[in-house]
Amino acid sequence: MAEPPKLRVLMVSDFFFPNFGGVENHIYYLSQCLLKLGHKVVVMTHAYGNRSGVRYMTGGLKVYYVPWRPFVMQTTFPTVYGTLPIVRTILRREKITVVHGHQAFSTLCHEALMHARTMGYKVVFTDHSLYGFADVGSIHMNKVLQFSLADIDQAICVSHTSKENTVLRSGLSPAKVFMIPNAVDTAMFKPASVRPSTDIITIVVISRLVYRKGADLLVEVIPEVCRLYPNVRFVVGGDGPKHVRLEEMREKHSLQDRVEMLGAVPHSRVRSVLVTGHIFLNSSLTEAFCIAILEAASCGLLTVSTRVGGVPEVLPDDMVVLAEPDPDDMVRAIEKAISILPTINPEEMHNRMKKLYSWQDVAKRTEIVYDRALKCSNRSLLERLMRFLSCGAWAGKLFCMVMILDYLLWRLLQLLQPDEDIEEAPDICLCHHRGVEVSEGLRKKIK
């Protein structure tokens, strides 16, 4: 018989496979490493197209694609209480001990954390983003975050800059916030066996083509670099609203033969695109931590990036050239990168990345956060309401009303369907037997 799981963790976010991005990769790789450490991990996300219901992924990772459809930017419509029945069922079925929510943008994450705390579960939140304080959208989002984190057990941020930002936005105690960086799968992102010729210098851009990722900067930077360096070409991977602007720039400056537009690039093809280049260009206007930079560095590319958010913390100074988010400064940074390109050794850079970043290390550090969360004392409803009341003169009262109603609905659900009536799901330990994955329960029959 296999040993019972150490912890039973529910990862919750609107962002997961088959969608691709930094948050999606983080949840997937962290879950896989936690499974290898002996924990049970279940993921809850919304349905993607016809992908709905329960699915199993590599290593026995169980994913609940709940029948909620994305509303805008891959997030579900905020129902506040609509997700309570299904969250309660999953928590009981999987015998969850820790609920781990990801990303401040995720509606599903905020609602699941609220319901989990109402039911007395330990909750952890990871913030993958940076937010401002001045515009209307940021003010609204910061208030939502303050509500979600008022009753949190522990929080994780992916950089020191992100930690400071989250503490300021949410009013959370810094003692409750841990800094655990992202990582990269260095086994997947390796340099090319034969380095591309430097006769033609290829600059690679892989990013969502949106304002926040600095697509407007690319429109100004690319023509100027092409004018200064006839032997430079660009490969741009990604899609988004700003794709049209880049196409117009290419037409306007007659750069069709020097700027290749790939469109959306699946994560499985990212490495094959990266190894065709010499320099990786990141033009983000705000970034808590950029996994794309790690992937490029692991493939042996020299990075040029904007000096924003947590980006300066990601790589050593000799592996990245930083610039202000200004077209002229970025052009100067690219010129500097081209001049030091002959000194770059891709294999040496890859080996350094293997030592600097590891998902196994991220998982072990996350384990410590889970242990800290489990040691936090359970608070009564009155104590929890006092926390929400301190969130503001009007907002505090509103938050208290929301939580009281959530508590009453949970009690009503317990009357309509007692906890004992929710069937517990069996633990399935996938192991390899003659090249086939089988459940622990079938192992004896096979033998």
UniProtKB/Swiss-Prot annotation:
Signal peptide positions (record): none
Parts of the chain on the Cytoplasmic side: 1-387
Keyword Secreted: no
Superkingdom of the source species: Eukaryota
Enzymatic reactions: a 1,2-diacyl-sn-glycero-3-phospho-(1D-myo-inositol) + UDP-N-acetyl-alpha-D-glucosamine = a 6-(N-acetyl-alpha-D-glucosaminyl)-1-(1,2-diacyl-sn-glycero-3-phospho)-1D-myo-inositol + UDP + H(+)
Enzyme Commission code: 2.4.1.198
Gene Ontology cellular component list: glycosylphosphatidylinositol-N-acetylglucosaminyltransferase (GPI-GnT) complex
Effects seen without this gene: Defective in pollen germination and pollen tube growth.
Membrane topology designation: Single-pass membrane protein
Topological region Lumenal: 409-447
Family statement: Belongs to the glycosyltransferase group 1 family. Glycosyltransferase 4 subfamily.
Function according to Swiss-Prot or TrEMBL: Necessary for the synthesis of N-acetylglucosaminyl-phosphatidylinositol, the very early intermediate in GPI-anchor biosynthesis. Required for pollen germination and pollen tube growth.
Protein name: Phosphatidylinositol N-acetylglucosaminyltransferase subunit A
